[in-house]
């Protein structure tokens, strides 16, 4: 009896070559189930088991038989190679899920540089490239490998939220300068009412509120958004300078009524002697003449 173990993915072979000794050619083969066989074993198709070779004897010699036992080992299945596209700031992804063809679990992964990899691709750490999955074979079957080609798309960067408080008399400025981080300059702005906006804020004209900055992402990366909150304070109004000539016997009056413009109330007065002049009530018969300052 002779025997052999083959891999189910091996090429077809002749059973006759496995017989020991110096067998006569021209015999017949019988398969394990008793059916006829042409003497060619096709791994993955032919049934494993004992194949009998028979050479007919010439009377009074009996027939001669020999047996070849074939065992078949299934090859490892590493699946069918695939591809994966991830965002550079996305979550970790199991590379195994990018393989098709029912791959066997328990294989090993290698990075593009050939070093070992756990199989969980982290876009924040791992490099793009070809990752190889290998499933070890049981002799005589060799190991098999498949690959996942990973492409990493750079995530959009809208920076971090910012806030600013300005006076309504300040010069126009760019909201972009208020953002933190390292925002890309390719984004667009929206007003608090979600209308398109140029990004140039003009205090006293542009309304205060929360402005949105959006940088578009390339698939599979989503858009990135940041916000700038703008508070606008109204500048104080002390009115415009004025002069007033009064008679010494006139009634007391409030100096604010003599200022030009539309001054805010609640300010403070300073007399000609640079001393506080509480209330701003000017008594022509008592108060000294001169320049009174309203702040």
Region locations from a protein language model:
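Proline- and Ser/Thr-rich low-complexity, intrinsically disordered segments
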Residues: 1-295
């Amino acid at each position: 009896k002779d025997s052999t173990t083959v891999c189910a993915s091996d090429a077809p072979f002749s059973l006759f070559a496995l017989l020991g000794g110096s067998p006569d050619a021209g015999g017949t083969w019988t398969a394990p189930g008793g059916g006829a066989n042409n003497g060619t074993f096709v791994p993955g198709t032919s049934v494993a088991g004992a194949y009998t070779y028979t050479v007919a004897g010439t009377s009074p010699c009996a027939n001669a038989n020999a047996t070849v036992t074939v065992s078949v080992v299934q090859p490892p299945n590493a699946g069918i190679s695939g591809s994966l596209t991830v965002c550079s700031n996305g979550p970790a992804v199991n590379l195994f899920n990018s393989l098709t063809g029912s791959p066997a679990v328990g294989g090993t992964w290698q990075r593009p540089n050939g070093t070992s990899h756990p199989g969980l691709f982290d876009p924040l750490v791992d490099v793009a490239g070809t990752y190889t999955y290998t499933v070890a074979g049981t002799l005589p079957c060799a190991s098999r490998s498949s690959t996942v080609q990973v492409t990493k798309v750079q995530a959009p960067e809208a920076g971090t939220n910012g806030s600013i408080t300005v006076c309504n008399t300040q010069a126009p400025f760019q909201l972009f300068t208020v953002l933190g981080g390292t925002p890309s300059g390719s984004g667009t702005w929206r007003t608090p009412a979600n209308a398109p906006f140029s990004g140039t804020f003009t205090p006293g004209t542009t309304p205060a509120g929360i402005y949105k900055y959006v940088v578009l992402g390339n698939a599979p990366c989503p858009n990135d958004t940041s916000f700038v909150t703008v508070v606008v304070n109204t500048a104080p109004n002390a009115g415009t300078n004025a002069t007033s000539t009064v008679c010494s016997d006139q009634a007391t009056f409030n100096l604010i009524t003599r200022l030009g413009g539309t001054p805010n109330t609640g300010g403070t007065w300073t007399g000609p002697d640079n001393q506080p002049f509480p209330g701003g009530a000017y008594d022509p018969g008592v108060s000294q003449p001169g320049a009174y300052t309203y702040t």
